[in-house]
Swiss-Prot record:
Its main location: cytoplasm. GO terms for cellular component: cytoplasm; nucleus; proteasome core complex; proteasome core complex, alpha-subunit complex. GO terms for biological process: immune system process; ubiquitin-dependent protein catabolic process. This is Proteasome subunit alpha type-1. It comes from Pongo abelii. The gene is PSMA1. The lineage of its organism: Eukaryota, Metazoa, Chordata, Craniata, Vertebrata.
Amino acid sequence: MFRNQYDNDVTVWSPQGRIHQIEYAMEAVKQGSATVGLKSKTHAVLVALKRAQSELAAHQKKILHVDNHIGISIAGLTADARLLCNFMRQECLDSRFVFDRPLPVSRLVSLIGSKTQIPTQRYGRRPYGVGLLIAGYDDMGPHIFQTCPSANYFDCRAMSIGARSQSARTYLERHMSEFMECNLNELVKHGLRALRETLPAEQDLTTKNVSIGIVGKDLEFTIHDDDDVSPFLEGLEERPQRKAQPAQPADEPAEKADEPMEH
C-alpha cells in the first residue's frame, strides 16, 4: 500500500468511499498467527497457533479467558487484544453483579462492536488492530463470533483469521457439514487439521505451539496448553508431506544446448 492524501486520518474518506486507516488496521490482523474457531451442537472450540518472539522467549498466549462461559482467541496486536479482553471481563462481571446471571454471548459481542466503532469515527484515534474469535455457550447454545477492526462482527459456524488463514478456511468450508454432528474430540481434531493447513510443509503442530480452548454444555471455558494438548495431538494422523523430487543422477549427460533459431 502507498501513502496518499486520504490516509492521514481515520475521519477522511477517499473519493472511492474508502477509509484507508481502517483497511490498514485490517491488514494488521493478517500479520498475526492463525487461529481457528468452530462449533457443534454442544460445544464451541478455539484452536490457535502460538509464536515466540525469539528462541529465548516463551510463546505468547493466543487464547484468553473472559468468563466461565466465554473465551477469545486473537490475531493482531496483543496489546489491543488485552485491552478489549479486560473490557469484556468487566462487562461480564457487571452482568453477574447487577442481574445475577451470565451475560449472553450475542450481547457481549454487540458491546464490543460498539466499543471498536468509536475510534473509527473520531479524530485523533486509531482503530483497534486486532481481530477476535469469540467462543461461548449460553441458553441459545454454542456460539462462534468474529470481530473486525472495522467494528463489524459476524456469527459463524466456523472461521479462521490470521496469517495464511485462507488455507484453514478452505478446509473448514470443505468439512463444514460434518461439524454439527461431531463429538468434542472429533471437533477438536477438525480444528487442529484446519490450523495445520496454515503451516509450511516442513512444520507441524506440537505441544509448544498449539493452544486449545473449549466451552460447551455443562463445561466451563477451559484452556489447554503444553502437555494438556498431547491427548488431542496423539489422535491426529500424520501430516501428508510433499513428495520429494528425485535427484538427477550425477553421471547423466547434460541436456543439449538449444540450437539457434533460423532467420
